[in-house]
Design a protein with these regions (language model features):
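Residue-level detector of anion-binding/catalytic polar loops
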Residues: 37, 98, 174
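Conserved SAM-binding loop
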Residues: 16, 43, 99-102, 133, ...
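Short, surface-exposed connector motifs at secondary-structure boundaries
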Residues: 92-98, 149-152
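Asp-based, Mg2+/Mn2+-dependent phosphohydrolase catalytic module
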Residues: 1-6, 106-216
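Short, solvent-exposed polar/charged micro-motifs at secondary-structure junctions
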Residues: 52, 99, 200-202
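N-terminal helical cap/lid subdomain that shapes the substrate entry/recognition surface
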Residues: 2-89, 95, 106-108, 119
Length: 216
């Protein structure tokens, strides 16, 4: 399967890197203090900024301390982040200025996870605190495309979360490649098991049939 695209926009957690277990541990500890009984992993909030989840679940008067607490907990575990299959090979093959990361994590955490996984950090890196509204709002991917000097319609987004897919579509992104079963029913161009085997050359994104979970 092939797509004509001028730029590549990647979500980070669940697409390029695996930080899921660390996030579960951090949020479980956070919930025990600020939202006892809440099962964070069952809330369907993957891809949403931490500060927006804190607003949903912590008492309003405790927002600042609750937000600082989850930021500290997640940063403590950032060093356990590892690359997901195919991520290093793909991004290492891409010319500078042709791709970036659009993560919901704040800048300190996002950079810590990328570096812990051994991935290159693009100059155009977009994080959750760069935008007024996080995913599923279009802001992250609008900013990512803008930093590459591209129209979103000429870009591809790689996403593993419904909130991220909705963000990409709201931004007018032309191609959305879903990663993993969580986005099988989302508005994606195709779904793959991982980035393994995906290539981009001369404006053509090639997705191997062996990795497809869902195609057009």
């Amino acid at each position: 399967m092939q797509f004509q695209v001028a730029g590549l926009l990647f979500d980070n957690d669940g697409v390029l890197v695996d930080s899921h277990q660390a996030a579960i541990e951090a949020w479980t500890k956070w919930c025990s203090v600020y939202s006892p009984g809440l099962d964070w992993d069952a809330q369907g909030t993957a891809g949403v900024r931490a500060e927006d989840m804190v607003r949903m679940w912590a008492p309003a008067e405790a927002f600042v301390e609750a937000n600082d607490y989850i930021n500290a907990l997640e940063l403590e575990t950032a060093g356990t982040t590892v690359p997901l299959p195919g991520s290093l090979a793909l991004v290492s093959s891409l010319p500078a200025g042709s791709w970036t990361i659009c993560t919901s994590a704040n800048r300190e955490l996002g950079l810590a996870r990328v570096r812990a996984a051994g991935l290159p950090v693009p100059a155009e890196f977009v994080c959750g605190d760069d935008v007024l509204a996080g995913k599923p709002a279009p802001d992250p991917y609008l900013l990512g495309a803008s930093r590459l000097g591209l129209n979103p319609s000429s870009c591809v987004v790689f996403e593993d979360a419904v909130a991220g897919v909705e963000s990409a579509r709201a931004a007018g992104v032309g191609v959305v490649v879903g990663i993993g079963s969580r986005v099988l029913e989302a508005d994606v161009s195709c779904v793959v098991s991982s980035l393994e085997g995906i290539t981009w050359s001369d404006g053509v994104l090639t997705v191997p049939s062996s990795s497809l979970l869902k195609g057009i």
